[in-house]
Amino acid sequence: MILPGDPKRCAKIAQYFDDPVLIADNREYVTYTGTLDGVKVSVTSTGIGRPSASIAMEELYRCGADTFVRIGTCGGMQPEVKSGDVVIATGAVRMEGT
């Protein structure tokens, strides 16, 4: 599962799938499924913030998803990380108040 926050990003990501199919579109949750090099893959938006991402991931897990890759934008605190850099986070500072 590829998980952007913004539902508009799902269609942009799905255009790289082989034969993408729109599965669902309900408020902040949009899902496309297709294949990449013969491997089934889906993209589902989670909405913004930890609570909505948690709800989405728990529901997707109950539907059988077992691998999640969260993608999107974020702020950073290290001056050496420039705009456009790809960052694979191993931790986070939770300041969202939830």
Question: Where is each model-derived feature located?
Answer:
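Metabolite-binding pocket within alpha/beta catalytic cores that recognizes anionic/polar moieties
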Residues: M1-T98
